[in-house]
């Protein structure tokens, strides 16, 4: 037995800090002493007792990330856990729709079972494919949902991104929702900018949460209508400012802090960084509640410093900067846990998750755009305008003459999406504003179907990048002046790898090589959302440009 003596317990049940002592036996909390009776209790215990005097340090439950896509870290779960445990996260709720779009059910089962210490819970992907406006590698049907929904650690139906299908009562979409209801499971939402009658209609079908709010009015309306509000602060989307709504309401129980997507280079200490940012709006205790008791109440977990609960907690030296003294995971100190994980042999990756880039090699001519590079025509052209720290894009309109000038200045880039699952030969072609100042980038990580996305203005560099990407089995490529500048192989589904240390080193080298190429801090993650048609306003898939959930022509 280990007794943590003289600690300040962060009581997430009451929002207090309470002086006390906590005893741990194996992986459980055996008792919590709030009456300073620890010495008397120890005397009665016949077994060996190790006493650790924390000298007033804070004891908090470990954290829950209630909405994250592990694939965005580019690590398989057994590598991902080595990073997030160091951040005090012991439970994650994932929606593995990235790998599901590539490998279907087999991909979901791999994500569910690969981690060894981290508790991984799954919300089953509801929208695979996300829409019929792109080509996916797999489909998850209502029948598939019913096959999987009663598995251990499956909590319900993942973010229902195709909200128009819900509002318009699409039969297949409603079947999936009904399966979740049938088994009393949770249903996560995803409804950017939805309000009023449409939001009510969406909620009426059983949607319980949302993480897509972009302004305070939107967040407040969703919260007031009964949705659990997930406020995300990740690598691509940074919405922590929405906590400003806490000045207008009196009850924060239905607010959670989540990450959604975190790149590996931001993964170390990511949840601690979220908490630090949150204290600009709420107290440290309230912030901790938003990553412990609040998500626990939604997902049905039992957390908190309580007898019988899992002995997983973070020991803080202070709450001003959330400086960590140590972390205990299931009764063991973090270093011991990490040593065990590092000694474990790697599991074999299922064959279906490997060698997933099935398109033919491309030539320079594949990266010419009709009406601009050949068979020129006058007119007005749609251009995607990306927004920093947001998944939302805007539509800009330029004349053909303006486009030519801006292309020459690299103020506008060409953007392509190459279908990679079924060798259809599809290439979506478009233009994007003010993203890449030099070189060409190509990636097989592109939401949600994860076709290959490429951006640049030099056809030779674009072809080189896309072909090299096929050779390495997927990942990230940067090319310039006819040479591959740097690359990161991600052979698992073309979106993940199985060596965290190597990937961390390689991605840092990649970003160092392309420094100054883009004004976007994380261009590969940012460009991965340019192909996500369920997010407004103008996106691109392998089938072409998408606006308002409809395919539109490049020329107006």
From Swiss-Prot:
Required cofactor names: Mn(2+)
InterPro entries xrefs: Adenine_deam, Adenine_deam_C, Amidohydro-rel, Metal-dep_hydrolase_composite, Metal_Hydrolase
EC supergroup of this enzyme: hydrolase
Molecular function GO labels: adenine deaminase activity
Superkingdom of origin organism: Archaea
Gene3D superfamilies, alphabetized: Metal-dependent hydrolases (3.20.20.140), Urease, subunit C, domain 1 (2.30.40.10)
Catalytic activity: adenine + H2O + H(+) = hypoxanthine + NH4(+)
An example Gene Ontology biological process: adenine catabolic process
Documented EC number(s): 3.5.4.2
Keywords: Hydrolase, Manganese
HAMAP family: Adenine_deamin (MF_01518)
NCBIfam families the record matches: ade
Family, per entry: Belongs to the metallo-dependent hydrolases superfamily. Adenine deaminase family.
Protein name listed in UniProt: Adenine deaminase
Gene: ade
């Amino acid at each position: 037995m280990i007794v943590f003596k003289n600690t300040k317990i962060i009581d997430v049940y009451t929002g207090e800090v309470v002086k006390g002592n906590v005893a741990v036996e194996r992986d459980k909390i055996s008792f919590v002493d709030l009456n300073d009776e620890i010495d008397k209790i120890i005397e009665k215990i016949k077994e060996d007792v190790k006493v650790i005097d924390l000298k007033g340090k804070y004891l908090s439950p470990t954290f829950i990330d209630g909405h994250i896509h592990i694939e965005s870290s580019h690590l398989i779960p057994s590598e991902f856990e080595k990073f997030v445990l160091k951040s005090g996260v012991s439970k994650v709720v994932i929606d593995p729709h990235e790998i599901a779009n590539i490998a279907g059910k087999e991909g979901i089962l791999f994500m569910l079972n690969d981690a060894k210490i981290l508790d991984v819970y799954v919300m089953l992907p509801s929208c695979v494919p996300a829409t019929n406006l792109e080509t996916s590698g797999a489909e998850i049907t209502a029948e598939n949902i019913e096959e999987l929904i009663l598995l251990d650690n499956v909590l319900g139906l993942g973010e229902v991104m195709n909200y128009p299908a819900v509002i318009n009562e699409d039969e297949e979409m409603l079947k999936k929702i009904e399966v979740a209801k049938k088994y009393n499971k949770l249903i996560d939402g995803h409804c950017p900018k939805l309000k009023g009658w449409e939001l009510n209609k969406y909620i009426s079908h059983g949607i319980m949460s949302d993480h897509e709010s972009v302004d305070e009015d939107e967040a407040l309306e969703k919260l007031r209508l009964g949705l659990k509000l997930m406020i995300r602060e990740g690598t691509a989307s940074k919405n922590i400012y929405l906590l400003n709504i806490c000045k207008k309401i009196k009850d924060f129980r239905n607010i959670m802090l989540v990450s959604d997507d975190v790149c590996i280079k931001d993964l170390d200490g990511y949840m601690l960084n979220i908490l630090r940012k949150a204290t600009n709006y709420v107290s440290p205790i309230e912030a901790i509640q938003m990553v412990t008791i609040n998500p626990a109440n939604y997902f049905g977990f039992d957390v908190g410093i309580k007898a019988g609960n899992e002995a997983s907690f973070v020991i803080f030296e202070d709450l001003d900067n959330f400086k960590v003294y140590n972390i205990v995971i299931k009764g063991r100190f973090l270093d011991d846990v990490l040593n065990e994980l590092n000694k474990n042999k790697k599991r074999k990756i299922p064959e279906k998750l490997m060698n997933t880039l099935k398109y033919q090699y491309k030539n320079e001519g594949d990266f010419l755009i009709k009406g601009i590079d050949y068979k020129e025509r006058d007119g007005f052209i749609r251009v995607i305008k990306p927004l920093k720290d947001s998944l939302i894009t805007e539509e800009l309109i330029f004349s053909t003459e303006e486009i030519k000038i801006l292309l020459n200045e690299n103020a506008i880039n060409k953007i392509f999406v190459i279908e990679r699952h079924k060798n259809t030969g599809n290439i979506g072609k478009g233009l994007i504003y003010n993203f890449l100042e030099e070189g060409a980038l190509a990636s097989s990580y592109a939401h949600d179907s994860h076709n290959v996305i490429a951006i640049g203005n030099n056809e030779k560099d674009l072809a080189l990048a896309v072909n090299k990407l096929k050779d390495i089995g997927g990942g990230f490529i940067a090319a310039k002046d006819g040479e591959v500048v740097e690359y990161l192989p991600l052979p698992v589904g073309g979106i993940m790898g199985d060596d965290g240390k190597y990937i961390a080193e390689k991605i840092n080298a990649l970003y160092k090589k392309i420094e100054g190429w883009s004004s976007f801090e994380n261009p590969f993650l940012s460009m991965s959302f340019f192909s996500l048609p369920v997010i407004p306003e103008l996106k691109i898939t392998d089938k072409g440009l998408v606006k308002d959930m409809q395919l539109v022509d490049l020329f107006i």
